[in-house]
């Protein structure tokens, strides 16, 4: 019995011999029955055409696998489960399907069909190669999500967009610099304003620019300031608004406030926007200016009387340094670092807990070891906390050090314990960093292939992708016609746009199924 993929017609049995029902046929040649020809067997139903119990041979780079068609038909939306998709790989001479793919990976791919949807990566196959195989065989997003969860990857959060067109355009303009040229220009302006604000914050602390009333000074300067506070208070308050640093700071705050308000009114969810840590940093970055401005106005109305404690005012001014974290909105590196720290909070908590135990243990030990030496600087266990922290982190400032033999032994053990304690959670943190880094890199590579927005924007994206891929050399198996449900091929007079190793088409009707998601069909050979 021979299996012919596509038609799957069984060879007719001989007309003569055998028992059972007589063969059905018809007479040919003239009015009489000169000879008898059996009729071909009836074609199976549409749903049963390929889902029979016949066996099929799959050749993966020379390694032959054999399975039943009904096993593959469990997942008709995949490459092997759809007879039309896998037909292009059929070799009629050898009566088998040939795929020039990774051989060790196909053990897990075939097990996916045999087990009813369980995906397991072979230990000798790298994660990135197995991910490419899942995409090539089109196992679907659900299989990819299961695989990533089994490998310990974090689930990517969806980024909703506003529903209104104008609101969505404004949100993309200020939140996603890579969305368009104007958005990239706004991001550059925002980065420049942040850098100018940080430079001004540092320069105004120089002695020639420093306002002695707001920043610490030497004791003699404090006495001189107190003596002349009554005479110079009003004039200094009057000149504060004409200070160049104040003018530049005001311009920066105007931009920060404008950017924050626009993003707040254009965001898809006000509650989510208010809980975002980056937005809270934006709010904290502009609050010190308004507090300082209110203090200056209160001093002018109070004839130079101090309206706020200098210590509180200096702390408020110090909060301005958090503006540097605003750069993380425009820096992929800082975002990766923040995501790594967030994902490694448990490991960091364990590290701090271990260091806390070590500090208590070794500070107590060194205190009692140095108790008999009057020249020792370890006057109490709390005083030894600083020495224990510096020693366990292998910094070693040298301001406090043991002098006795017992103290030196304790110090040696403290340093060794610190090295071991810090080294334990480092591999996990590095693994998280590598994951976020490779995910960001993979996202940037696939961003040029992904279909973003509606169908009406596809033509321009297709033209750009054709230009980008015009010089690439592709094998015959790289271009795959992806057929989605509900698509009418007669409605596609235009040339399909090709994304590396996949082919996608899009109509201009209002059917959401007429657009093919490039992320779902992206394959690699």
From Swiss-Prot:
**Gene Ontology MF terms:** delayed rectifier potassium channel activity; outward rectifier potassium channel activity; voltage-gated potassium channel activity
- Give the membrane topology: Multi-pass membrane protein
| Cellular compartments per GO CC | axon; calyx of Held; glutamatergic synapse; membrane; membrane raft; plasma membrane; postsynaptic membrane; presynaptic membrane
**What catalytic activity is recorded?**
K(+)(in) = K(+)(out)
Its annotated compartments are: Cell membrane
Keyword Membrane (UniProt)? yes
The UniProt record lists the keyword Cytoplasm: no
Q: How is its activity regulated?
A: Activity is up-regulated by JAK2.
GO biological-process terms attached to the record: action potential; corpus callosum development; optic nerve development; potassium ion transmembrane transport; potassium ion transport; protein homooligomerization
Extent of motif Selectivity filter:
394-399
The family classification in the record reads: Belongs to the potassium channel family. A (Shaker) (TC 1.A.1.2) subfamily. Kv1.3/KCNA3 sub-subfamily.
Oligomeric state and interaction partners are given as:
Homotetramer. Forms heterooligomers with KCNE4 which inhibits KCNA3 activity by impairing localization to the cell membrane. The stoichiometry of KCNA3 and KCNE4 in the heterooligomers are 4:1, 4:2, 4:3 or 4:4 respectively. Increasing the number of KCNE4 subunits steadily slows the activation KCNA3 and decreases its abundance at the cell membrane. However, a single subunit of KCNE4 is sufficient for the cooperative enhancement of the inactivating function of the channel. Interacts with SEC24D; this interaction is reduced in the presence of KCNE4.
- Protein name stated in the entry: Potassium voltage-gated channel subfamily A member 3
* The species this protein was found in: Rattus norvegicus
Q: Which gene encodes it?
A: Kcna3
